[in-house]
Amino acid sequence: MKRTMLISLVFLVAIAALFGCKQQQQAQWSQGQAGQNQVVTPPAMIKSPQEVQQLESLAKANPKNANAWIALGNAQMDAQRFAEAIVSYQRSLELDPKNVDVRVDMGTCYRGVGQPEKAVEEYRKGMKIDPRHPMAHLNAGIVLSSDLGRKSEAVKEFEKYLELAPNAPNAADIRQDIQRMKSAK
């Protein structure tokens, strides 16, 4: 009994630390701390295979814990193991289908495995849940522009992003991109 309680406590502390850090990073990055023409992914926190393996064990031991699957997906994404992250994010969405952050991260992973249409689909699913999620619009704009060549759709997404985050550090760059795309028509 004590061992089970100890394992549960260790699990909760690990998840809280990882999930809390990821949420804080995402909040900082949602203000637009991103480079041009790349889907925005917060800086990698977890890279070692051992750390990912520990989170995988924790998620499998607690399969009904959405946060465990999110933490695993985040770690896999940070380690650029995008296909595995997609599976983990799908598991978390089975438990919490309205998590927009997970939808956006999963979209980024779809781009990472060369499926830009699926990436945009996930960003748009996130936008249906929360139309005011700036990163969904920014990342959709980037994929639409850079990967799919759908500039007019990209402009709309970038404009919505700027409406939601007008003072983002990358706002001037995004405005320039919009002007370039509009003048190229």
List the predicted regions and their residue ranges.
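Residue-level detector of the short coil/turn that links helix A to helix B
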Residues: I46, Q80, G114, L148-G149
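Canonical positions in the second alpha-helix
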Residues: L58, R91-S92, K125-G126, K160-Y161
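Structural marker of alpha-solenoid helical repeat scaffolds
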Residues: A61, L95, I129, L164-N167
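Helix-start (N-cap) detector for alpha-helical repeat units in TPR-like alpha-solenoids
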Residues: A66-N67, V100-D101, P134-M135, P169
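Canonical tetratricopeptide repeat
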Residues: A71, D105, N139, I174-D177
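Residue-level recognition of tetratricopeptide repeat
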Residues: N74, T108, I142-V143, R180
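Position-specific recognition of the canonical hydrophobic site in helix A of tetratricopeptide repeat
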Residues: M77, V104, T108-R111, S145-S146
